[in-house]
Amino acid sequence: MAIVGVGIDLVSIPDFAEQVDRPGTVFAETFTPGERRDAADKSSSAARHLAARWAAKEAVIKAWSSSRFSKRPALPEGIHRDIEVVTDMWGRPKVRLSGEIAKHLEDVTIHVSLTHEDQTAAAVAIIEEP
């Protein structure tokens, strides 16, 4: 397998928390019901966990963009909603794609790592192809 794209994103948790549930913001329709449910089940702030998931979505988009270097970006509408961060029974994150982006990335493996500490959430995404 060869790495074809790497993306990273940082999110200010306080800034994100102010906007996440505000109508009319990009965040209002960004998260799937499963992502919101998982964040609500955590012992700490739901906004902290959603901020890490937002960072993961952005990191995936950046990794995808970097894999298309010198090619026109082809980002479909509502792309963030089509990138879902799910976890296994041990809490390890994985990206599940749907919609148009799933068609563009059907033959790749996406690795993702999320973290949050104090006021910041971060994520890294690596895209590999066979």
UniProtKB/Swiss-Prot annotation:
Known catalytic reactions: apo-[ACP] + CoA = holo-[ACP] + adenosine 3',5'-bisphosphate + H(+)
A biological process term (GO) from this entry: fatty acid biosynthetic process
Class in the EC hierarchy, top level: transferase
Cofactor or coenzyme needed: Mg(2+)
Main location: cytoplasm
InterPro entries recorded: 4-PPantetheinyl_Trfase_dom (IPR008278), 4-PPantetheinyl_Trfase_dom_sf (IPR037143), ACPS (IPR002582), Ppantetheine-prot_Trfase_dom (IPR004568)
Function: Transfers the 4'-phosphopantetheine moiety from coenzyme A to a Ser of acyl-carrier-protein.
Record protein name field: Holo-[acyl-carrier-protein] synthase
Gene that specifies this protein: acpS
